[in-house]
């Protein structure tokens, strides 16, 4: 009776009024959310500009007081020499900090890599412990590293203005080791992209060529360090986010085993996903700098502040070892066709290693498509992207994430249908779509078990060949801006080692030649799908851009991985600075 009366009331004029009211409310709500997002963009950019102005004024004051300082000579010092001069007193921490502040301000004009000036770095100079391994060293931080009094926005409007109440654990340890964190650097919106753009701070450009992406998600770090604006930085990696920007910007980067360094206090857009491991790692111009950073972080303070981290100090004797290595290698994973420059980089490195007395044997991890399409994609999106999408309510979606957000918003039944229809023509896309559907707790446990079984199978395969380390291609050269988000399959060389949770680092070994670039006309890819076509187009016009190789070791063998990287660096040593 009540329902019929309600229906009668709604069927008349009042029903029309109610419908109009609901529609109006929806429009107003949408407009309000849009205005909120616009306000966040305005505030974020105002703060960014204000911070950069404060940086510049501080630098100008210092230069007026120290007109005879040779900034170029200081900036040219490798990190180990810089540390020696700081600890001996030959250089003051003030001279080093303000010189790098000036360089960071300068290179930011062409790259847009700095999001926030960590203003207390000036007062911290007097507080830094002299005995620390990183005494007086300026360190840049990917924006997700929580820093007291500053926001870690991840390029999302809901995080704008939400300042951290304390430093994350690794930042605390850096300070205890005498380092001076001085800037936050840009990331792609949500950090789930290997490009580097977001609505709050805009696009970061590659220092070697502004029309190219710096990589992501630690793209601001790659651009800043690659252009000489920071001697050392920290990034994170869940699919290649340290390795892409390091490779694209011509620097070195290490993704350690997931739990070797603390993640406590890091900002994320998705919490609780553990199937595919996130790693914290260093980025720098040379491998010795990475090793010094790892040695500094793997100390008693880290193990005290985060008891979930295994108390494994850095093993210097492994890093300094000179025994010949038995190296597995592959030219291709048969999933993403290597560009001519990628293939040449691996083969030239192989030949140099053999000439230096190391043993190189062919090796390819088993069942790579399964690891990528089922395990990695399924692990990252076991909830169908639900947690991820919560971050975008009322926010703008950056173009670098447009395709991903669109796919994740599709209902489960439609993803399944689309996957079925696409499978005959585009099997890779179909497989990824299928894996991005939400799954039950039972299915998630099954997936996690499959990941562990796959990991053990690759370790067994590795040990059966008695390998020390593995040499692989690394995607390169840098792609055009706004291209990485439309070439998802190209993460195959990196995300495999997140799925396996093996330490992996990249070292630049060559640059793209005119012949490499010309041969890209014949590049087809293995599948001929849209990912292959976009990749081909996005990697053209790369003459002179850096190309890296990837060095991999078994879990918890970061020192051996770095030792291998240092050997590759010693043998190859290309020009590392953008011209």
UniProtKB/Swiss-Prot annotation:
Membrane-spanning ranges: 9-29
Any one Pfam family match given in the protein's UniProt record, by short name: Amidase
Reactions catalysed, as given in the entry: N-(5Z,8Z,11Z,14Z-eicosatetraenoyl)-ethanolamine + H2O = ethanolamine + (5Z,8Z,11Z,14Z)-eicosatetraenoate; (9Z)-octadecenamide + H2O = (9Z)-octadecenoate + NH4(+); 2-(5Z,8Z,11Z,14Z-eicosatetraenoyl)-glycerol + H2O = glycerol + (5Z,8Z,11Z,14Z)-eicosatetraenoate + H(+); N-(9Z-hexadecenoyl) ethanolamine + H2O = (9Z)-hexadecenoate + ethanolamine
Membrane topology: Single-pass membrane protein
Biological process per Gene Ontology, one example term: monoacylglycerol catabolic process
Disulfide bonds: none
Residues annotated to bind substrate: 191, 217, 238-241
Annotated GO MF terms: amidase activity; fatty acid amide hydrolase activity; identical protein binding; monoacylglycerol lipase activity; phospholipid binding
Subcellular localization, as worded in the UniProt entry: Endoplasmic reticulum membrane; Golgi apparatus membrane
Modified residue annotations for Phosphoserine: 241
Intramembrane region list: 404-433
Residues exposed to the Cytoplasmic side: 30-403, 434-579
GO cellular component, one term: organelle membrane
Gene3D superfamilies found in the cross-reference section: Amidase signature (AS) domain
Keyword field contains Endoplasmic reticulum: yes
Quaternary context: Homodimer.
Role noted for this protein: Catalyzes the hydrolysis of endogenous amidated lipids like the endocannabinoid anandamide (N-(5Z,8Z,11Z,14Z-eicosatetraenoyl)-ethanolamine), as well as other fatty amides such as the taurine-conjugated fatty acids (a structural class of central nervous system (CNS) metabolites), to their corresponding fatty acids, thereby regulating the signaling functions of these molecules.
UniProt-recorded name of the protein: Fatty-acid amide hydrolase 1
């Amino acid at each position: 009776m009540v329902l019929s009366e309600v229906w009668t009331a709604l069927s008349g004029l009042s029903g029309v009024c109610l419908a109009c009211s609901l529609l109006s409310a929806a429009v107003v709500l949408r407009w309000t959310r849009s205005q909120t997002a616009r306000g966040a963009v305005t505030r974020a950019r105002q703060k960014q500009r204000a911070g950069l102005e404060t940086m510049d004024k501080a630098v100008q004051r210092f230069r007026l007081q120290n007109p005879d300082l040779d900034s170029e000579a200081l900036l040219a010092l490798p990190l180990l020499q810089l540390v020696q001069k700081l600890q001996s007193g030959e250089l003051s921490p003030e001279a080093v900090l303000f010189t790098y502040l000036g360089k960071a301000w300068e290179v930011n004009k062409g790259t847009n890599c700095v999001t926030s000036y960590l203003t207390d770095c000036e007062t911290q100079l007097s507080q830094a412990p002299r005995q620390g391994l990183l005494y007086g060293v300026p360190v840049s931080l990917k924006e997700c590293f929580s820093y007291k009094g500053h926001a870690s926005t991840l390029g999302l409007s809901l995080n704008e203005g939400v300042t951290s109440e304390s430093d994350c654990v690794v930042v605390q340890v850096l300070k205890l080791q005498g380092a001076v964190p001085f800037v936050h650097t840009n990331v792609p919106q949500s950090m789930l992209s290997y490009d580097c753009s977001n609505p709050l701070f805009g696009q970061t450009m590659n220092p070697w060529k502004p029309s190219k992406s710096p990589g992501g998600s630690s793209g601001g770090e790659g651009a800043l360090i690659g252009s000489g604006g920071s001697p050392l930085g920290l990034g994170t990696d869940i699919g290649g986010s340290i390795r892409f920007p390091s490779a694209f910007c011509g620097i070195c980067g290490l993704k350690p085993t997931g739990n070797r360094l603390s993640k406590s206090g890091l900002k994320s857009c998705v919490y609780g996903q553990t199937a595919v491991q996130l790693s914290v790692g260093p980025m720098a111009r040379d491998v010795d700098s990475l090793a010094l950073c790892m040695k500094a972080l793997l100390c008693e303070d880290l193990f005290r502040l985060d008891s979930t981290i295994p108390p494994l100090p850095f093993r210097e004797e492994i890093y300094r070892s000179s025994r010949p290595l038995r190296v597995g290698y592959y030219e291709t994973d048969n999933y993403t066709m290597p560009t001519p420059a990628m293939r040449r980089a691996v083969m030239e490195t192989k030949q140099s290693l053999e000439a230096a007395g190391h043993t190189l044997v062919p090796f390819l991890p088993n069942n790579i498509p399964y690891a990528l399409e089922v395990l990695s994609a399924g692990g990252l999106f076991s909830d169908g992207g639900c947690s991820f999408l919560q971050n975008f309510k009322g926010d703008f979606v950056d173009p670098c994430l447009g395709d991903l957000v669109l796919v994740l918003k599709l209902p489960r039944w439609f993803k399944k249908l689309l996957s079925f229809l696409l499978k005959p023509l585009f099997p890779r896309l179909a497989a990824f779509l299928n894996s991005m559907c939400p799954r039950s707790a039972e299915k998630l446990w099954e997936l996690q078990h499959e990941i562990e079984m796959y990991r053990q199978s690759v370790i067994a395969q590795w040990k059966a060949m008695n390998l020390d380390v593995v040499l692989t291609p690394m995607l390169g050269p840098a792609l055009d801006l706004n291209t990485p988000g439309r070439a998802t399959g190209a993460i195959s060389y990196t995300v495999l080692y997140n799925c396996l949770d093996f330490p992996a680092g990249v070292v630049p070994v060559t640059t793209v030649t005119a012949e490499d670039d010309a041969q890209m006309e014949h590049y087809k890819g293995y599948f001929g799908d849209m990912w292959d076509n976009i990749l081909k187009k996005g990697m053209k016009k790369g003459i002179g851009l850096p190309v890296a190789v990837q060095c991999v070791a078994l879990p918890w063998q970061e020192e051996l991985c770095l030792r291998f990287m240092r050997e590759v660096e010693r043998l190859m040593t290309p020009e590392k600075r953008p011209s």
